[in-house]
Design a protein with these regions (language model features):
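Solvent-exposed, non-transmembrane regions of integral membrane proteins
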Residues: 1-728
């Protein structure tokens, strides 16, 4: 039996190494992903699975039926994957309007015949109102007398063949992903169903280790110390800009920005954040900053407010600090300093930094030339409403002369009012423009409620002060609690109540941000790095409050985790910009997949902080073995729901992927690292196979080290590796 144990766990360790190395090699050579579907790697999985099943039987795991069912479900899932690898066909089919085909191109370039012909009756793109952002791709199909449609997240199935709308080509034809997997999907889904049922069975079983720990651990009065608040200050500015009243009136206009109609305030806020990293600059609001660049470009071109992160680009521009002015982008003979490096960007030392600097210069250039202010709604010959700027050359030819002059000359008139200081006339001008927008914008305009909600969101969404406060409070509370516990002391009740109040207030504030973001964007806010980190911060507090009775250290941990994740969100890990969702992302399965995994990550973070707390206690008092053992039991208790939720989240993502593009596992780096994380933490369940995990300090060390896989899954993949999940 020892040989079987070493074989199964040894092969799993080898598989983990191959998985991790493969994701890194994909960054260098995209063809490296082929290793995951190669015969030798499939054989490695097969031998591991067979040896693991044999080890389960020899160790009589079947005497603990819930645990046996969990392990058996993974064997069924792997059997389904093997069946798909042996029998399935995947490829691409391109059809033009009115054309039909009875074959498709496989991934390896060969051609596979279908037992029927498929005809594309019509293909159409549905757009978000008033924009050029695609909302859905819809193909109307017919075959064997059967009519149907294929669109994003809506599969057309016929005789075992599944057709997924993946896009369209330059000639207006439709592009489908074709999947023919009549056996593998059924086996795999059966494994998913067995996994879900067995997880529920295990968690409810009275004989499981989880329930044993739940009964054993009882609440003990422990708490935390008080809070440290941070004050923020602002200063007045001498830079030329609109007065606050007129700037707010300008921000109250509608504008086409980010493929949607929103308050111009939103554009101003993100314009300012993009340039300098904050929503305000030198005591001026975002609307005032935008107005300064719009009406006083010469003065503002001298101001060093463009944040340059790259040291290489700073050297190229010849600046000493981190901020550049527009004039720094030009030489003494008026040559654009980035022009030549951009031509040979592959040879530049920091191409990403160069692109970011060029993008910041470009958004200023587009604003000052009037191209980015698309504030004028106009109808074309078909009655379709589009939004245009003063600098656009594609204004509909049907536009009458008076309206054409209004579009082309109104901002010049506004500039004249600004230069002569006629502020009341400027207010009247903005009022008239807004009336024009409401009269001609039609169905493209957001509702008044949504418009006001977005302005409220813009006002409250800067959570940096909150994040700083929570991190300071959480750090002081966390380490104070650890030191008190090591000495056998208790913090005062008022400190605990204060910390609870801070945690609840923070949770309510973040809840307001999330609800506003959800309402304004029209989708669950889990589509990018900013939104998922904000959701993780939101999860941290209720988890801490629920766990506090049995694990008192959870409260300061929750405050600290909430602060750290909020700060990461505010640092702009994904440029927090609301935009219309890509069609493939409009799925409730995706939202459930992200939400479940984020809750799992929050639990794993608590376990890592438990480990850190144990090491702090050990350094302060080597006799604090009882407290360290209790922390270990708390981490063990959290380990079960954390890994179970992570597992469910991974396979929810697999189902979503299969529904969306016909492949429930595509070896994307994010998928691979989520799998690595799940396996790494699953090792910790096997105390019988790894007796050293029973030792408290060894267990805590493993939990701290294992959390690095979570960090790499989120940050490493998002910002260093490539793939469909990369946010950077």
């Amino acid at each position: 039996m020892r040989v079987l144990k070493k074989t199964s766990f040894g092969l799993m360790a080898i598989i983990l190494v191959v998985l991790a190395v493969g994701t890194i090699l994909q960054k260098i050579d995209s063809s490296a992903v082929a290793a995951y579907t190669s015969p030798w790697f499939v054989a490695l999985w097969t031998v591991m699975a067979v040896s693991a099943v044999a080890y389960m039987l020899r160790s009589r795991l079947y005497r603990r039926l819930p645990a046996f069912a969990v392990h058996a479900s993974f064997a069924v899932i792997l059997a389904g994957a093997l069946t798909s690898w042996l029998t399935s066909e995947h490829g691409t089919l391109r059809l033009k309007d009115g054309a039909e085909a009875s074959a498709f191109t496989l991934d390896d370039g060969s051609v596979a015949k279908m037992p029927f012909s498929l005809k594309l009756q019509r293909f159409e793109i549905e757009y978000y109102a008033g924009t050029e952002a695609p909302m859905d791709f819809v193909s109307h199909l017919s075959t064997d007398g059967v009519n149907g449609t294929a669109s994003m997240n809506n599969v057309f199935s016929h005789r075992g063949y599944r057709f997924y709308q993946s896009g369209y080509d330059s000639e207006g034809g439709s592009v489908f992903t074709v999947a023919h997997d009549p056996m593998g999907i059924g086996v795999t889904y059966a494994g998913y169903a067995l996994l879900l049922a067995s997880i529920c069975w295990f968690m409810m079983s009275g004989k499981s280790r989880f329930r044993s720990l739940l009964r054993k651990l009882s609440a003990k009065p422990l708490a935390v110390v008080g809070a440290l608040m941070v004050a923020m200050s602002a200063q007045a500015s001498d830079l030329p800009a609109l007065p606050q009243q007129q700037a707010e009136e300008m921000g109250n206009l509608y504008v086409l920005y980010g493929d949607r109609i929103c308050p111009l305030q939103t554009m101003a806020k993100e314009f300012t954040e993009k340039l300098c990293g904050n929503a305000t600059f030198d005591g001026l609001s975002a609307e005032q900053v935008l107005s300064g660049w719009l009406y006083y470009p010469t003065d503002w071109s001298k101001v060093p407010m463009i944040k340059i992160k790259s040291a290489e680009v700073r050297r190229l521009l010849g600046i000493d600090g981190k901020y550049a002015s527009v004039r720094d982008f030009f030489s003494d003979v008026n040559e654009y300093k980035l022009e030549k490096p951009l031509r040979g960007i592959d040879r530049f030392a920091d191409p990403q930094g160069l692109r970011e600097a060029a993008e910041k210069f470009d958004i200023i250039n587009r604003l000052t030339t009037g191209k980015s202010l698309k504030i004028f709604p106009l109808k074309d010959a078909e009655g379709k409403i589009g939004w245009f700027s003063q600098g656009d050359d594609n204004i509909p030819v049907e536009t009458d002369t008076q309206e054409w002059m209004f579009v082309k000359m109104s901002l010049s008139y506004a500039n004249e009012l600004v230069q002569t200081g006629r502020w009341s006339d400027l207010s009247d001008f903005y009022t008239k423009v807004r009336k024009y927008q409401r009269k001609n914008g039609g169905a493209t305009l957001p509702s008044d409620t949504r418009f006001k909600a977005e302005k409220t969101y813009n006002t409250v969404s800067n959570a940096r002060p909150l994040a700083i406060t929570l991190m300071c409070v959480g750090l002081v509370a966390f380490f104070s609690f650890c030191l008190l516990s090591a000495r056998g002391g208790r913090p005062r009740r008022w400190a605990v109540l204060t910390l609870r109040a801070i945690a609840v207030a923070a949770w309510l504030y973040i809840s307001v941000i999330i609800v506003l973001l959800w309402f304004v964007s029209g989708h669950i806010p889990m589509s990018n790095g900013y939104e998922t980190m904000l959701f993780l911060a939101w999860c941290a507090v209720p988890i801490a409050m629920l766990a506090e009775r049995r694990m008192p250290l959870a409260l300061p941990m929750g405050v600290l985790l909430c602060g750290m994740t909020t700060m990461v969100a505010m640092m702009g890990i994904s440029n927090p910009r609301m935009s219309q969702l890509m069609p493939v992302l409009q799925s409730p399965l995706l939202s459930a997949h992200v939400a479940v995994i984020m809750v799992a990550y929050a639990l794993l973070a608590f376990m890592a902080m438990n480990g850190i707390a144990a090491f702090v206690m050990r350094m302060r008092n080597r006799a604090a073995t009882d407290e360290i053992t209790v922390l270990k039991e708390h981490s063990e208790l959290l380990l079960y729901p954390a890994v179970m939720l992570l597992t469910i989240g991974i396979f929810l993502g697999a189902v979503w992927a299969n529904v969306s593009w016909g492949r429930y596992w595509g070896w994307d780096p994010k998928e691979v690292w989520a799998l690595i994380t799940m396996i790494v933490y699953a090792f910790a369940f096997h105390r019988e196979s790894f007796p050293w995990l029973r030792r408290p300090m060894a267990f805590h060390a493993y939990m701290v080290l294992a959390f690095f896989s979570v960090l790499f899954t989120y940050f490493g993949v998002n910002f260093f590796l490539t793939g469909m999940h990369s946010y950077a």
